[in-house]
A protein has these predicted regions:
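C-terminal, non-catalytic "cap/extension" segments appended to globular domains
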Residues: 1-130
Length: 130
């Protein structure tokens, strides 16, 4: 997901074909930074990656990872205070579920969590940090 999100950002923010930029070279640069598994030189993944240019995803593919950050961080409060802690559940209901789209999502998250989102819980969930 990180590779896809970075590729999406680079294409929408920096990609300049009129200045000689090439899609496969752009992806290769990103893969050097973050890829875990090498891909074959004959691969043409970008030619079929329609998400980044269709369906409202333009420069928004990162949202999959961002959703994981928010979900893991919110759940970590339950882990810290007890999965079945009534007060934690009520706070989640009051500050997230019952508010829906009536307020800015980040304001609701910060009200529930008491702080800005942090990556630690997601990294731990992925087994990257322990």
């Amino acid at each position: 997901q990180l590779e896809f999100g970075l590729f999406d950002f680079r294409l929408h923010a920096e990609f300049r074909p009129d200045q000689g930029a090439k899609i496969l070279e752009t992806l290769a640069e990103i893969k050097k930074l973050v890829a875990v598994v090498p891909s074959p030189s004959w691969g043409r993944f970008p030619h079929a990656f329609s998400h980044i240019c269709a369906g409202g995803y333009a420069a928004g593919y990162y949202s999959y990872l961002w959703a994981d950050v928010l979900a893991a961080d919110a759940f970590s409060r339950f882990e810290e205070e007890g999965i079945f802690n009534r007060e934690t559940g009520q706070s989640f209901l009051d500050n997230i579920l019952s508010r829906g789209g009536s307020e800015e999502p980040m304001d609701l998250f910060k009200r529930f969590r008491g702080r800005e989102p942090q990556l630690d819980a997601m990294l731990e969930h992925y087994g990257i940090k322990g």
